[in-house]
Amino acid sequence: MDYTLTRIDPNGENDRYPLQKQEIVTDPLEQEVNKNVFMGKLNDMVNWGRKNSIWPYNFGLSCCYVEMVTSFTAVHDVARFGAEVLRASPRQADLMVVAGTCFTKMAPVIQRLYDQMLEPKWVISMGACANSGGMYDIYSVVQGVDKFIPVDVYIPGCPPRPEAYMQALMLLQESIAKERRPLSWVVGDQGVYRANMQSERERKRGERIAVTNLRTPDEI
């Protein structure tokens, strides 16, 4: 690197530091308005706040919960997505993550906790057992939590990795940003519009079937 003691002219044509250029402001009031005033729709601002401050309910059922908690460590840092504030009460949470096997005796408890959550609220089904019962096709295991509560995002895997949980959070944030719901109390039908999100399986189908790198049977 070449060093020089020549002073850089911030207003010169051959300026190497464009961020240091001094702008000539004709109207200081207009400059302050541009810096401090944001024009947009109220629904978009509310959804922006909701999707970036999701409070998950601290509730786990099985080994998938261990992977969920792993995402809160410094290696993954789920705080980047604003979902690191675990709540111990369903009345203070807006996201329930059903992580693990849902037994028949546990279904009424999950249903009651879900009913205690305030609107708006969302549900993530984490793991094969929560999605469809997994390997436990028996009388004591519910074959999917969507049998008694609505589910917004499904995470496949047994158990899924923490990266899959964070991807589910990003998909949920994308869905929340497109939601439309009343901003005040409404008697009767709330008129909530939820975006019809395409499944990851269908979205990546073209990439999945486009076989470009063929491996030999010995490498598979």
From Swiss-Prot:
Its cofactor is [4Fe-4S] cluster. Coiled coil: none annotated. One of its GO terms (molecular function) is NADH dehydrogenase (ubiquinone) activity. It is found in: Cell inner membrane. GO terms for cellular component: plasma membrane; respiratory chain complex I. SUPFAM superfamilies: HydA/Nqo6-like. NDH-1 is composed of 13 different subunits. Subunits NuoB, CD, E, F, and G constitute the peripheral sector of the complex. This is NADH-quinone oxidoreductase subunit B.
